[in-house]
A protein has these predicted regions:
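Helical "lid/coupling" subdomains associated with nucleotide-phosphate turnover
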Residues: 1-23, 27-29, 44-46, 52-342, ...
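Acidic-residue sensor for enzyme active/binding pockets
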Residues: 13, 41, 377
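Acidic, divalent-metal-coordinating active-site segment for phosphoryl/phosphodiester hydrolysis
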Residues: 38-44
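Short, solvent-exposed amphipathic alpha-helical segments in soluble enzyme
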Residues: 114-117, 375-379
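A short interface-forming secondary-structure element
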Residues: 359-376
Length: 380
């Protein structure tokens, strides 16, 4: 076939995992942990830059054959701790956040999501606190037989090494004093690709570039100039109304994203376009987005051009959303943005705040725009 096959060592494997996580997750300071059959890879990332990579001879199959099959749990723990000593000799600050890569850690995250009845069926970016879930990891590692594993909801294809994987992960989390785990749906494969793609930019996307937003715009935006206008106007509206809504600037970024992507639903199907966009956004903003952020963007689009959402409207995802007041302000601002450019003329608008009233100065009087603005429900 003419394939050029390269064999990489464990340190390089760890590096590739770090490249994938640093580009495709929202976090910028963490250590990746990739538990395999024969080894576990660690990559330390600080402020978005990879500092150190290391591979240790700790793997599920190795631990199973050397210790678990002989019921030597104490020996397994000592073996893992002895190997982890190499990490403390790296002269690197150990983060409180672990990014989990690989099948064992993803399988454990799925169990935790199911146990907690998590409202999104999305693994990449799923985050949990170690103190809340360490007990479950401990119970899985002590399972007596397949029936015990089955009772946890573990799938049959994971029976062989899930106990060992859970034991290794639990021991690592405790020894590194980890507080938070972020689940990664990407790993070595994506890291190899990104390392080649970004070879001239230190293996990092530009600071203001989001691969998910770019992908959705490339596939579904109706007009590039319209998308850019909606994004720029969103910033102006947010800043003009800041004395009223008093929202953190992180919501401005999300309002810009929602405004740029608001036409996706119409491209998919004109009827119920907002509902179509809602489902699509939840699953489409895969990379470099917190779960909370993608839910906010989805709800902002869903309630554009509509009456303000009620508490009942956001009930399903309330644990991932800010207060109802914040959601209503986001809904209002995107609705105002869309109304101002209802005829796609991209008017040059001036916003003036006087006596607690927002004045919108348009270059030309438009009955269509004015009537649509009048229909928008305002937050209290």
């Amino acid at each position: 076939l003419g394939l050029n096959i390269k064999v990489i060592d464990g340190e390089k494997e760890a590096y590739f995992g770090g490249v994938a996580a640093s580009n495709l997750l929202h976090d910028d300071t963490f250590v990746t942990v990739d538990i395999g059959g024969g080894s576990t890879e660690f990559c330390f990332v600080k402020n978005g830059k990879i500092e150190k990579s290391i591979s240790l001879n700790i793997g599920t199959v190795r631990i199973k054959e050397l210790y678990f099959n002989k019921n030597n749990i104490d020996g397994a723990k000592k073996y893992i701790l002895d190997n982890l000593e190499k990490i403390f000799k790296l002269d690197v600050e150990i983060p409180k956040k672990v990014v989990g890569i690989g099948g064992s850690i993803r399988a454990l995250s799925k169990l935790i999501m199911a146990k907690n009845q998590y409202p999104l069926d999305i693994l990449h970016g799923y985050t949990y606190e170690v103190k809340n879930e360490i007990f479950l990891l401990n119970r899985i590692s002590k399972a007596k037989n397949c029936e015990d594993l089955k009772s946890f909801g573990i799938k049959k294809d994971r029976f062989d090494t899930i106990k060992e994987g859970s034991f290794i992960f639990k021991t690592i989390l405790e020894e590194l004093k980890t507080q938070t785990v972020v689940t990664s749906g990407v790993g070595v494969r994506e890291g190899v690709y990104l390392t080649d793609l970004l070879r001239n930019s230190n293996h990092k996307f530009p600071h203001n570039f989001n691969v998910s937003v770019k992908s959705l715009l490339d596939r579904f935006q109706i007009d590039e100039k319209q998308s850019a206008y909606f994004g720029n106007n969103a910033k102006k509206i947010f800043d003009s109304l800041k004395p009223f809504h008093k929202l953190d600037n992180k919501y401005k970024e999300l309002l810009v994203v929602a405004s740029k992507l608001n036409s996706i639903g119409s491209v998919l199907n004109f009827y119920k376009s907002n509902d179509n966009a809602f489902d699509f956004i939840l699953n489409g903003l895969n990379y470099d987005f917190l779960h909370t952020s993608r839910v906010i963007v989805a709800y902002t689009i869903k309630f554009s051009k509509k009456s303000l959402p009620s508490q009942e409207d956001i009930l399903k995802h309330k644990d991932l959303l800010p207060s109802l007041e914040v959601v209503q302000w986001m809904s209002f601002m995107i609705s105002l943005n869309i109304a101002i450019n209802q005829d796609f003329s991209r008017p040059k608008v001036e916003y003036v705040l006087e006596n607690k009233t927002l004045k919108i100065n348009l270059p030309n009087k438009s009955f269509l725009i004015e009537s649509n603005i009048d229909k928008i429900e305002t937050p209290q």
